[in-house]
Regions:
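Expand to "…catalyze enediolate/carbanion chemistry for C-C bond making/breaking, isomerization
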Residues: 1-240
């Protein structure tokens, strides 16, 4: 696989790994990176099958020009280690780790990634590890997270869980996200990382709100957007 640093990544498009029709379509919309999701969108009873879907989907499409990521379950679940073991291979560019709150979270994931790379005959450190910062604890630990592991190339921000964690009202002006965005931007700079990737926008039929959110993120030094609908990809590219 091509090194994930070879191109700037602006759009990261999520789709549930356990929905074959959605998986087929996600490769057709021109996203810079595709993230097949094993976390929020996949029921516990379907996680094992979804892991195989990740491998099948990515290994069938080598050298597409799109970067391939998998979002595993968080480090404090019983699923994360097996998610990594089952999906890592030469078809993958990186792993998205949700709900990261400290450097120790990354160190545990690093051990599992290194073992999986070795088992597949891959170069140690080949895979990107992208933490999503989406809690108050994660935001306050952003500098530690950004400087803990050389595998990290960029961080991402999850506004949904962040605002739930703090009981904030997430309105269109996104004032409640300003502090977290600033913290992540500062941390990325101090860690010599690429610009962070901004939060999803849940209102998938409101293009103007998405564009406004993307512009706010860009003002804070972010380099792209997490997307949850194909229509958000070209909007992301319009801003970044």
């Amino acid at each position: 696989m091509t090194d994930a640093t070879a191109m700037p990544l602006r759009s990261f498009l999520f789709t549930p790994a356990n929905h074959p029709r959605r998986v087929e379509k996600v490769f057709e919309v021109g996203a810079d990176a595709v993230i097949l999701d094993l976390e929020d969108a996949v029921a516990v009873s379907e996680k094992a099958g979804a892991r195989q879907c990740v491998v099948d989907a990515f290994s069938a499409r080598p050298n597409s020009g799109t970067q391939y990521y998998v979002r595993v379950n968080s480090i404090d679940t019983p699923y994360c280690e097996e998610d990594i073991k089952a999906t890592v291979g030469p078809w993958l560019h990186g792993v998205v780790l949700p709900k990261v709150e400290s450097g120790s979270c990354l160190n545990r994931a690093e051990q599992w990634l290194a073992a999986a790379e070795a088992a597949c005959g891959m170069t140690l450190g080949q895979l990107d590890l992208m933490p999503i910062i989406e809690t108050a604890a994660g935001v306050e630990s952003a500098k530690e997270i950004a400087t803990t592991n050389s595998r990290i190339r960029r961080m991402a921000f999850g506004g949904g869980d962040y605002t739930l964690d703090l009981n904030y009202e997430w309105n269109a002006d996104e004032a409640v996200l300003a502090y977290a965005r600033a913290k992540l931007s500062h941390a990325a700079r101090l860690g010599n990382l690429e610009p962070p990737i901004d939060t999803v926008v849940l209102q998938i039929r409101d293009d103007e709100r998405f564009l406004q959110s993307a512009r706010y993120g860009k003002q804070f030094g972010f380099g792209g957007k997490l997307c949850i609908h194909p229509s958000q990809v070209p909007l992301t590219h319009d801003v970044f």
